[in-house]
Structure formats: structure tokens, C-alpha cells
Amino acid sequence: MEESEYESVLCVKPEVHVYRIPPRATNRGYRASEWQLDQPSWSGRLRITAKGKVAYIKLEDRTSGELFAQAPVDQFPGTAVESVTDSSRYFVIRIEDGNGRRAFIGIGFGDRGDAFDFNVALQDHFKWVKQQCEFAKQAQNPDEGPKLDLGFKEGQTIKINIANMRKKEGAAGAPRTRPASAGGLSLLPPPPGGKMSTLIPPSGEQFSGGSLVQPVSGSGGATELWPQSKPAAAATADIWGDFTKSTGSPSSQSQPGTGWVQF
């Protein structure tokens, strides 16, 4: 193990109990009911640490922190840590001393939550170890790893809907030109129910209903506006024309001193 590897703490539980377990006579699993659960051999603190790929279950005194026993775990689940068959709060661990001696002891937690955290801490550590091994293999042989194929398979098609894009392009077209008004100003529409204002013509002439009106002096000095009648047609200008043709007179005007028309 390299000297540069540091030790990290994975889990700490303030109370754990240690039990002596009887030798297993058969290959069946351990049963916590066969232990003397009311008489634990030792009680203290449990701490799980990791250094490199190996996890360590350490049983320490809860006051002084003195190490009571230690169980190295290089694989989980495995022979280093086993669960009992009749409870989720008890486990069998394999402890080792510095001289190479090994022994199996039973540990138990008073709370099921502590037992769950103990189990999950070991699972997460060895899941991380497995990922590190896979990354190392891929780094050594990058060509052997799975390649991501983004190409189209034979006969495979893709459909793209660009209806929204066309709508956006039409909305973002050339802006509509506004009609220019005289003087750079535009006339506002009249308010609802109001009357349109009339344009003021030059002095001496006025418009009324679309026809030109000339001022006519009337009584009292007031100016009255009368529509200028259109001249009659030339064919009907002289109503006495048929009578004057017989006498050869070109005029239909009355003679001076008489009120009769000459026939």
C-alpha cells in the first residue's frame, strides 16, 4: 500500500455491542438468537474508515478512543462481514491483529437506523472501488471501450418540423411603411360620436357639402352662404328660340318701351 494514500472516515456510530459467538457447526448462516444478547462482552464506539481500496471496521473506546479490535474489509459482501439470518441489527465480522491472528465476533446495534447506515457505508465504498477499477481499465485500453455511434442506421429517417420557424420568419419580415403626411404629422381620427371638422377655404370662398359657396350680401349687413348653381345647358338657355327663328331676329330680348316679344 502506498504511503501517499490518506485515510477517510465513512461512518461513526456512538454505541455498538460485541458478542462471543458459538462455533458454526454447519454451513447455515449465523443466528443472533443463539448469542447471549443480554450479556454483551464489550460496548463502545464503531468507526468505519477507508484507506485506498480497503475499508476498516474499528471498535474503539467511546471515551478515550483506544482501539479494541479492527476488521479489515477488502470485499463486501464477503467473509469479512456477514449478516445474520434472523435480524437486521446484528452482524458477524472477522477481526485481525497485527500478528496475523483472526477471530469472528458478533456485533449488534440498538437502533435499526444505525445498522442500516453501517451497511450502506460499506456498499458505497466498494461501489466506488468498482468504478475506479473500470476507469483504470478504460485508461489503459481506450480502444476496447464501447464507442458511441451517432450515425443513422440503414433505412432510418428523421422528421423535422419547421412550421414554427416559417411563422417566425414571416413575422420578422420587412416592416410596413407608414404613409407620410404633410408636415410630418398625421390627423387623428375623430372621437366616437363627434363631428368631423371642416377644412377652412381661402377668404371669400367656402365649401359646403362638396360645392363652392360664395358670400352674398343680404339684409342687415350679414353674409349669407348660398350654393352656386351650375349654368344651364346651351340648348335650353333661350326658351323663346323657336319663335324668334320665324322672324329672323337673333335675339329674344324684349324691345324697349314694350313688354312683348317680337314674333
From Swiss-Prot:
Q: CDD domains per the record?
A: PHear_NECAP (cd13228)
Q: Which GO terms describe its biological process?
A: endocytosis; protein transport; vesicle-mediated transport
Phosphoserine modified-residue sites: S181
Question: Looking at the record, which segments are called Disordered?
Answer: 167-191, 209-263
Compositional bias of kind Low complexity: 246-263
Principal cellular location given in the protein's record: membrane
List localization entries.
Cytoplasmic vesicle, Clathrin-coated vesicle membrane; Cell membrane
Q: What keywords is this UniProt entry annotated with?
A: Cell membrane, Cytoplasmic vesicle, Endocytosis, Membrane, Phosphoprotein, Protein transport, Repeat, Transport
Tissue expression, per UniProt?
Expressed in brain, heart, kidney, liver and lung (at protein level).
Signal peptide boundaries: none
Would the keyword Cytoplasm be found if you checked this record's keyword annotation?
Answer: no
Annotated motif WXXF motif 1: location in the chain? 218-221
On subunit structure and binding partners, the annotation says: Interacts with AP1G1 and AP2A1 components of the adapter protein complexes AP-1 and AP-2. Interacts with the GAE domain proteins GGA1, GGA2 and GGA3.
Concerning its family, UniProt says: Belongs to the NECAP family.
What UniProt notes about the protein's domains is: The WXXF motifs mediate binding of accessory proteins to the ear-domain of AP-1, GGAs and AP-2 through hydrophobic interactions. Selective binding to the GAE domains of AP-1 or to the alpha-ear domain of AP-2 is tuned by the acidic context surrounding the motif and the properties of the second residue of the motif itself.
Q: What is this protein called?
A: Adaptin ear-binding coat-associated protein 2
Q: Which organism is it from?
A: Rattus norvegicus
The gene is Necap2
